[in-house]
Structures are given as structure tokens and as C-alpha cells.
């Protein structure tokens, strides 16, 4: 992992996801983790551009909304802009130097690129809704309610960067002492630095997972509600549907990584780290739960919108938290979460397979590209001979 291209032969089927031999040839014919290849193919098939969605009607409808409802939409847009500003660079900048599985390496690059499309989407929306979109962007870093969430995410990414430097420094020091024929007093310095980094990485993965699993969904609910229950702003709902579809892939990826580490696929040390960090991982999720509830209060401080209110949004957040924590192997202290989905109608926006539309009536958001199976064997060819 100290070189951009490992020239030594590597058995990719036996490489761990992190801290392995270092990446060499980018190859996609074999994978230790088929899930990552499936996510890559799916994400590529989802490729879209926000400019493809016309927002002229949305702009006219937005301008007719009461000011407090405009504020709800704008604040959510600001918050999502911040989240995807982080996710548009942090996974690549922080995780990729530690990755040793080729398919995971490509998945993180693909995932991060898709987040930049999300960021561009917010610019597309703002250009269409506001006379001065730059003013809206400039206000984001001045919003305390938004920025405290950035700090709670960024500090875990930053800690991985710090721990990575400390591990690299420890390796260099051990190598220097060895080359000089000197005896290093602290013989465990490198291993200790690596384990500290592993713990930091494990917790950072939970922060990423919580971000993808919960943080976007208050904003999603509000945006989809404008279309579903208020019957306005269809274009924005379609863009957010594209984004939500991508985020579910990203969530599946982080959940898979976490569960593999917890199960010991990459070694028993990860199992021990998962056990040691379980309470801190639970605390991470519960902090996200509290912050999103605070965000709901902030959004609806001047009034509710048809179909949504603070109480139902809190129930939605609890419902998501219990489900998402279970999916990543964590116990959840919430005991009074609703059993039934508080917003069952949102599923039609989160699952693109649920909605069927006539192509001549609406712009399809469920159209996939690059979905042809090119694997044709001799048996398939023989079956076609009867037609010739």
C-alpha cells in the first residue's frame, strides 16, 4: 500500500479488503467479494445527468409556496449539498489508500463519482429555483444547524487520516532502525499504530453507514412529500429519486463491509475490534438519531406541511434507526419505535421497480443502460440454429 502499483504477483482471491499486499493490476474477471462487482455494474447502469430533468414547472410552483415551506425545501437542499460535498471526496481521499481488494477499490471510486453527480444536482436545482444560487451556497457554511452535522461526520474521516499518517510514520521508523542496525525500544509501535488505525477505520465505516442510512431521509421525505401529498415539484422529486436510488447502493456497500469485518472474513482481529467498539458504534447511530430529530424540529419550527409534521418525522427517524442498526449488526436501545412504516407511500420513490409509467407520458427514472448479457455459450448458439 506504499506504492500506486504493486508489481509483485498477488492472489486477489485471498486478499483482505484493507491492509493487504497493495493493489496491482485492475482486473474484473475474478473477485473475492462478488457484491462489489454487482454494485459497480448497478451504479454504472444508473448513470444519469441532472440536466436531463426539466425544472421550469417546479420553479413556478416553488415561488407560490408560503415562505416557511420554501425555507423547508431550501434548508434540506443546503443540508444535502453539505453531505454530498463530504461524500464526493472523503471516501476516495480517506479509504482508498488502505484498500487492498481490487473490486472494493473500483467500487469506492465509482461510489465517490456518483456522489459528485448528486452535488451537481443541487446546483442544477438551485439555478432553476433561485435568482441568486450563489447566495444560497454561501449561506450553508454560516448555518450552525447544518455545520454541526458536518463536524460530527468529518472528525471521524479526519481521525482515519491522522491514524494513517501515524501508522506510516511508525513503519518508517521501524524500517530506519532496522537499516541502521539499531534496536528500537518500543518493538510494538508499528502494530499498535496499525490497530489504532483499524479501530478508527471501523468506526468511520459506521459513521458513513449512518450517513447513508439515516441522514438523507428527512430531506427525502420532505421532497417526496411535496410531490406525493401536495402534487407539486415533480422534477425535484425525480432528481431526488435518482439520488435515493444511488444512496441505497452505497448503503448496501458499507453494510456489507461492516458485516464482513464483524464476521471475521478478514481475520479475527477485526472481530475483536468490532466487539470493543460496539458501544461507540451504537453511540454514533444514536447521535445521528438525535441530530436528525433536532433537524426535524428546526425544519418545522414555523409550521408543518400537508402530510408531514415533527412527531411523524420523529417516528420515521426511529423506525429507520432500529432497522439500519439491526442491518449492520448493532443492538438498538430504542424500544418504542413504530413497527409499521410511518410513511409507507415513500416506498414508491425509494424502489424504482414499484412504479410503472407510460414512456410517452412522463420521463422514465427507472431506465437502465448497459444491461445486456453478452455471455453467449455454444448451447445458446445451438438453440438458435433451428431458426436458420
Swiss-Prot record:
Reaction equation(s) it catalyzes: a 2'-deoxyribonucleoside 5'-diphosphate + [thioredoxin]-disulfide + H2O = a ribonucleoside 5'-diphosphate + [thioredoxin]-dithiol
Catalytic residue list: 122
Pfam family of the protein (one): Ribonuc_red_sm
The organism's place on the tree of life at top rank: Viruses
Cofactor(s) this protein requires: Fe cation
UniProt cross-references to InterPro entries, sorted A to Z: Ferritin-like_SF, RNR-like, RNR_small, RNR_small_AS, RNR_small_fam
One BP term from GO: deoxyribonucleotide biosynthetic process
Keyword NAD recorded: no
Keyword set, alphabetical order: Deoxyribonucleotide synthesis, Iron, Metal-binding, Oxidoreductase
Enzyme nomenclature, EC number: 1.17.4.1
GO molecular function: metal ion binding; ribonucleoside-diphosphate reductase activity, thioredoxin disulfide as acceptor
Leader sequence segment: none
Residues the record lists as binding Fe cation 1: 84, 115, 118
Cofactor note: Binds 2 iron ions per subunit.
Amino acids binding Fe cation 2: 115, 212, 247, 250
Stated family: Belongs to the ribonucleoside diphosphate reductase small chain family.
Function description: Provides the precursors necessary for DNA synthesis. Catalyzes the biosynthesis of deoxyribonucleotides from the corresponding ribonucleotides.
Subunit structure: Heterodimer of a large and a small subunit.
Protein name per the record: Ribonucleoside-diphosphate reductase subunit beta
